[in-house]
Amino acid sequence: ECTEETLKGLGFDQMSQEESIAVCEKIFSKYLDGHRLMSNAKHLRGSAMWLNFRRISCQKWSFGNVVLLGDAAHTAHFSIGSGTKLAFEDAIDLADELHLGKPLEQALKDYEDLRRVEVLKLQSSARNSTEWFENVERYLDFEPIQFAYSLLTRSQRVSHENLRLRDKNWLEGVETWFAGKATQ
């Protein structure tokens, strides 16, 4: 993720993939410790490597006996890593609805009604995460612990108390840090 200003200012929109990677290697050299950056976008050329995420939310997920699943019906920004999860859950719920022996039209309607709620929840989290990354400049002056906390809770899928379940000691350190800041 980067802002339009950064994309154009560094010339990424005009560079080849190799040139773009070379610039990023220079920018992040002190963190790469001599290692090279890798790209999984071998098939992309030029500015296509720098994609604007396309949010898809189809009004209807089926037509006749053709059914859309996953990203074909609804996308969730890749920053929350749930695209495959949504597709598999769609497939499972569709199979369950079809297995109940309902008329096809009713099974497809019930599948869509059931899945749409879960999809909207994840799309909302994905939107929050996307906005965090699109506005990352506002967090760059945070101290590392505050930046990490903000990053971990950006989608609102991971709450303060959920962090406690995941890493109690780390969160207690965050709370101590925040309390110290509040009393300065």
Which residue ranges define each predicted feature?
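Conserved FAD/dinucleotide-binding core of flavoprotein oxidoreductases
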Residues: 1-51
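Conserved mid-domain beta->alpha element of the FAD-binding
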Residues: 47-128, 132
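C-terminal helical "tail/cap" subdomain of flavin- and related membrane-associated enzymes
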Residues: 96-184
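Phenylalanine-focused residue identity feature
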Residues: 12, 28-31, 53, 63, ...
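Polar low-complexity intrinsically disordered regions
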Residues: 18, 61, 81, 182-184
